[in-house]
């Protein structure tokens, strides 16, 4: 009795099957990711030039002539309060250079927030800048939420998470594993036809910038609502219980000190409650009140602690505190090792707590260091590099669309999905990769499961859909 054996696939056949399996997932991920990649790169370009755009738009209320004598900040504050008696001053930001005006963030009764600019040499109010109308605010809101709130944030997180799949699959497709890929590795074949040219440009540019793209994806995901806010940021939030002891805490968090979509507080402090001032009228305790303690004394103490460029948040209510912060998240400084946040009792002037770089977790330190790179704040060369990266990401996205356009089935209602080659065992390799990424990035995992369900329940069972997705 003879035994029938199933021939084992050759190594070349297995590589071919794995190649097309990877290409299919690269294609599907790209369908979702490319529009978001273009949006993120374009809004990122606007945000990179925020300072230049703002100074051009509001030159008359920002540019001043430096003088020898600077007026006390308390006098500048008084001028703002006199000019806008019904408004509440919430923040003071000293100018980063002597030929620019200081800023006071002012909350008006209609809920709008504006910067009131003041000449620090004369304490004269120069004008206002509507914070909600800045190009940065507009671009940052699109960059983070698509202007639709949490659902926009979730969609961007899905795109960034699937971007990891796009990146991993793209690297595999680019590596010179077989002769076909070796022929175009690290070279662009101009005379071999349009499809080869665009493929080489797309693959080599994406492959060479893969680590840069991974950096932008991971650092960007750290701000996202699920992976960032619920997982990574929560794990790295500053441990106030053990460090701040029994000091009273409010329900106000550091994130509440941000303005709009602007991130002004350190990433690892955003979910941490802000300490409270000891109200001098308490029933069980009397705290020494310093009637002379105000913004000038806050700044003097901040300077004594080592603050250079910073911002001051004013107390909110009777138990509020003065918060002085200098961090890379807000762009106050570029060296993450100088990150520092301090809270002062508004009555006694006592330093309630101080958090510095040394207190950060390893991931929080990585975020503080990475944010300057992400925002192009380190130097003019960092900004130029980020501009080139944004343009490269746009080119990678466009070349991907061009590649699809050139190989799409013309005259047919078909998407042009890369072909499938069935082979026992190969699908497990792809599935393991997808599972690892899906577990590491929950929204990517949920999207993959949804895609598989739609494929199994609808696409594979409805003839027209099956043809369209082929």
Task: State the predicted function of each range.
Residues 1-470:
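Conserved histidines in hydrophobic membrane contexts and catalytic metal-binding motifs
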């Amino acid at each position: 009795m003879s035994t029938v054996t199933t021939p084992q696939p050759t190594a070349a056949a297995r590589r071919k099957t794995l190649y097309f399996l990877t290409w299919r997932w690269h294609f599907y991920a790209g369908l979702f990711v490319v529009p978001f990649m273009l949006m993120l790169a374009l809004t990122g370009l606007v945000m990179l030039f925020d300072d230049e755009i703002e100074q051009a738009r509001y030159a008359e209320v920002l540019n001043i002539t430096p003088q020898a004598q600077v007026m006390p900040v308390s006098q500048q504050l008084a001028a703002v309060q006199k000019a806008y008696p019904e408004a509440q001053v919430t923040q003071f930001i000293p100018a980063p250079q002597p030929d620019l005006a200081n800023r006071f963030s002012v909350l008006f009764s209609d809920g709008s927030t504006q910067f009131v600019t003041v000449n620090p040499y004369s304490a004269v109010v120069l004008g206002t800048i509507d914070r909600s109308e800045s190009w940065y605010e507009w671009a940052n809101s699109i960059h983070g939420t698509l202007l639709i709130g949490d659902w926009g944030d979730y969609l961007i997180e899905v795109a960034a998470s699937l971007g990891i799949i796009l990146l991993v699959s793209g690297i595999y497709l680019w590596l010179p594993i077989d002769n076909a890929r070796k022929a175009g590795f690290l070279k662009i074949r101009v005379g071999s036809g349009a499809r080869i040219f665009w493929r080489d440009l797309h693959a080599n540019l994406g492959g060479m910038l893969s680590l840069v793209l991974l950096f932008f994806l991971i650092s960007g995901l750290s701000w996202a609502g699920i992976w960032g806010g619920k997982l990574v940021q929560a794990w790295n939030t500053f441990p106030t219980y053990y460090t701040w002891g029994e000091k009273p805490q409010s329900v106000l968090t550091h994130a509440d000190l941000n303005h709009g979509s602007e991130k002004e507080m350190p990433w690892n402090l955003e979910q941490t409650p802000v300490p409270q001032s000891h109200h001098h009228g308490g029933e069980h305790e009397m705290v020494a009140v310093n009637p002379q303690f105000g913004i000038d004394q806050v700044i003097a103490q901040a300077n004594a602690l080592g603050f250079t460029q910073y911002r001051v948040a004013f107390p909110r209510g009777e138990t509020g505190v003065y918060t002085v912060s200098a961090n890379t998240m807000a762009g106050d400084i570029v060296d993450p090792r100088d990150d520092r946040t301090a809270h002062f009792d508004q009555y006694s002037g006592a330093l309630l707590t101080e958090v510095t770089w040394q207190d950060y977790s390893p991931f929080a330190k990585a975020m503080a260091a990475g944010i300057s790179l992400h925002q192009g704040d380190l130097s003019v060369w960092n900004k130029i590099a980020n501009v080139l990266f944004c343009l490269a990401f746009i080119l990678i996205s466009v070349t991907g669309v061009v590649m699809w356009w050139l190989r799409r089935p013309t005259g047919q209602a078909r998407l042009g999905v890369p072909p499938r080659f069935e082979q026992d065992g190969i699908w497990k390799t792809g599935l393991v990769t997808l599972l690892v990424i899906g577990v590491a990035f929950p929204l990517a995992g949920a999207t993959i499961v949804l895609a598989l369900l739609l494929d199994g329940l609808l696409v594979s069972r409805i003839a027209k859909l099956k043809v369209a997705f082929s």
